[in-house]
Swiss-Prot record:
Role played: Component of the cytochrome c oxidase, the last enzyme in the mitochondrial electron transport chain which drives oxidative phosphorylation. The respiratory chain contains 3 multisubunit complexes succinate dehydrogenase (complex II, CII), ubiquinol-cytochrome c oxidoreductase (cytochrome b-c1 complex, complex III, CIII) and cytochrome c oxidase (complex IV, CIV), that cooperate to transfer electrons derived from NADH and succinate to molecular oxygen, creating an electrochemical gradient over the inner membrane that drives transmembrane transport and the ATP synthase.
Compartments (UniProt record): Mitochondrion inner membrane
A GO term for molecular function: cytochrome-c oxidase activity
Domain of life (superkingdom): Eukaryota
Family: Belongs to the cytochrome c oxidase subunit 3 family.
Membrane topology label: Multi-pass membrane protein
Name of the protein: Cytochrome c oxidase subunit 3
Primary gene name: COIII
Catalysed transformations (reactions): 4 Fe(II)-[cytochrome c] + O2 + 8 H(+)(in) = 4 Fe(III)-[cytochrome c] + 2 H2O + 4 H(+)(out)
Annotated organism of origin: Pisaster ochraceus (Ochre sea star)
EC code(s) of this entry: 7.1.1.9
Record keywords, A-Z: Membrane, Mitochondrion, Mitochondrion inner membrane, Translocase, Transmembrane, Transmembrane helix
Transmembrane segments: 30-50, 81-101, 126-146, 158-178, 196-216, 239-259
């Protein structure tokens, strides 16, 4: 009886607190990992974060699908929230590109007054990075196919296309990890290595998050949680995935191709 209104008034929840604690544990764990080579706190923070995400998303799915709390007004509010979240992510990556161009457009004498810096062998942009570009752009096509299938009520094609999208996301992550292990330079190799691994690493983290987001949507699709007029969870995931696609295009053009 407490929800006989169209507004988004959330119930008391422990998950923001556990999420904040997990973030503190992970950042503190990273510091310990860097300085004393101990990964225990980082792993515990990661486990707590995963448990928080599982339980928080479970509660949201329960509210949206089974309790009917996600009215039109609530859905519109969630849309605005997702748009603002993606905008904040744009600002995050803008900072990485700023750092890259600040260093590359006017390389200092310590770098040999050249870009890439003297002694750095860049990754060939027409090998694994080009394949990764094709993989990620293909996943953008398949997630759009899934969206249109949901809108038209074609559940079978929606499941097929979303499964393919998740597979392409996992494949991209494997290729990126392979590229890192095979890289001729490290994050410690001047500002070139720092900007390269921070920018592409954060993008890879976003691909992992987006893949998890889409995998949850696939599970919900199997369980008949989406209809052609009520599927904002999938819409939010697809927006996020398209954002990841666009960021990769800028990374490929600026850092891999022009930066090499």
């Amino acid at each position: 009886m407490t929800h006989q209104h169209p507004y988004h008034l959330v119930d008391q929840s422990p998950w923001p607190l556990t999420g904040a604690i997990s973030a503190l544990m992970m950042t503190s764990g990273l510091i310990l990992w860097f300085h004393i080579n101990s990964t225990i706190l980082f792993i515990l923070g990661t486990v707590l974060l995963v448990l928080t995400i599982i339980n928080w998303w479970r509660d949201i799915i329960r509210e949206a699908t089974f309790q009917g709390f996600h009215t039109l007004s609530v859905s519109n509010g969630l849309r605005y929230g997702m748009i603002l979240f993606i905008t904040s992510e744009v600002c995050l990556f803008f900072a990485f590109f700023w750092a890259f161009f600040h260093s590359s457009l006017a390389p200092t004498i310590e770098l040999g007054v050249s870009w890439p810096p003297t002694g750095i062998t860049p990754i060939n942009p027409f090998l694994v990075p080009l394949l990764n570009t094709a993989v990620l752009l293909s996943s953008g096509v398949t997630v759009t196919w899934a969206h249109h299938s949901i809108l038209s009520g074609n559940r079978v094609e929606a499941i097929q296309s979303l499964t393919l999208t998740v597979f392409l996301g996992v494949y991209f992550t494997i290729l990126q990890a392979w590229e890192y292990f095979d890289s001729p330079f490290t994050i410690a190799d001047s500002v070139y290595g720092s900007t390269f691994f921070v920018a592409t690493g954060f993008h890879g983290l976003h691909v992992l998050i987006g893949t998890a987001f889409l995998a949850v949507c696939l599970l919900r699709l199997y369980n008949f949680h989406f209809s052609n007029h009520h599927h904002f969870g999938f819409e939010a995931a697809s927006w996020y995935w398209h954002f990841v696609d666009v960021v990769w295009l800028f990374l490929y053009i600026c850092i891999y191709w022009w930066g090499s």
